[in-house]
Amino acid sequence: MIIRDENYFTDKYELTRTHSEVLEAVKVVKPGKTLDLGCGNGRNSLYLAANGYDVDAWDKNAMSIANVERIKSIENLDNLHTRVVDLNNLTFDRQYDFILSTVVLMFLEAKTIPGLIANMQRCTKPGGYNLIVAAMDTADYPCTVGFPFAFKEGELRRYYEGWERVKYNEDVGELHRTDANGNRIKLRFATMLARKK
């Protein structure tokens, strides 16, 4: 049962809309202990918390976390817990039912990715889920925007061998950034919802 829809926090607080893949994931992933890695201004964390998920929301930007805390207080979301952390230097041990990272990994140092994904996998309870959406660098859509990291073709899928992939694709999507002509930049995005066996 959805208590707050995807437009609630957008309309009331002018946040970016909840990511479409999070909206799809909640059709499968039941409320439980959740970790949002790179939560930004809370577009996903606030939606999840308002709909019964117990959310840890982490981001390196203290101003973003302060904004999440402000909205959390107004909305009385006691099941939302924030922390300022640099994902490039992060290790964690708590067990989660759902760990998500949407359009965040491409902003991290490439050397961080294998360890961070391993940490996500280790800290996911059996039967729990990981959701990742991140930019790719492919021959047909090369990543020219200067991200420190972008997945190669099939790379994210290989990280999750042995997991049940509920959804996986490497479809073309658009960044919010635009090119010199004002057109949104197109890239492939690795999109995956996987369940730990």
From Swiss-Prot:
Q: Which GO terms describe its molecular function?
A: methyltransferase activity; S-adenosylmethionine-dependent methyltransferase activity
**Cellular component terms per the entry's GO annotation:** cytosol
GO biological process terms, alphabetically, are:
methylation; response to antibiotic; response to tellurium ion; response to toxic substance
Q: Which reaction does it catalyse?
A: tellurite + S-adenosyl-L-methionine = methanetellurite + S-adenosyl-L-homocysteine
Q: Where in the cell is it found?
A: Cytoplasm
Top EC class for this record: transferase
Keyword set for this entry? Answer: Antibiotic resistance, Cytoplasm, Detoxification, Methyltransferase, S-adenosyl-L-methionine, Tellurium resistance, Transferase
Q: What is the effect of changing D36 to A/N?
A: Loss of tellurite resistance
- Stated EC number for the protein is 2.1.1.265
Binding-site positions, substrate: R177
Q: What is its main location?
A: cytoplasm
Q: Pfam families from the xrefs?
A: TehB
**S-adenosyl-L-methionine: annotated segments:** 86-87
Q: Where does S-adenosyl-L-methionine bind?
A: G38, R43, D59, T102
SUPFAM superfamilies from the xrefs?
S-adenosyl-L-methionine-dependent methyltransferases
Q: Which InterPro entries match?
A: SAM-dependent_MTases_sf, TehB-like_dom, Tellurite-R_MeTrfase_TehB
Family, similarity comment? Belongs to the TehB family.
Q: What's its job? A: S-adenosyl-L-methionine dependent methyltransferase that catalyzes the methylation of tellurite and is responsible for tellurite resistance when present in high copy number. Can also methylate selenite and selenium dioxide. Is thus able to detoxify different chalcogens. Cannot methylate arsenic compounds.
Question: Partners and quaternary state?
Answer: Homodimer.
Q: Which PANTHER family match?
A: TRANS-ACONITATE 2-METHYLTRANSFERASE-RELATED
Which NCBIfam families does the entry link to? PRK11207.1, tehB
Entry protein name: Tellurite methyltransferase
The source organism is Escherichia coli (strain K12)
What gene does this protein come from?
tehB
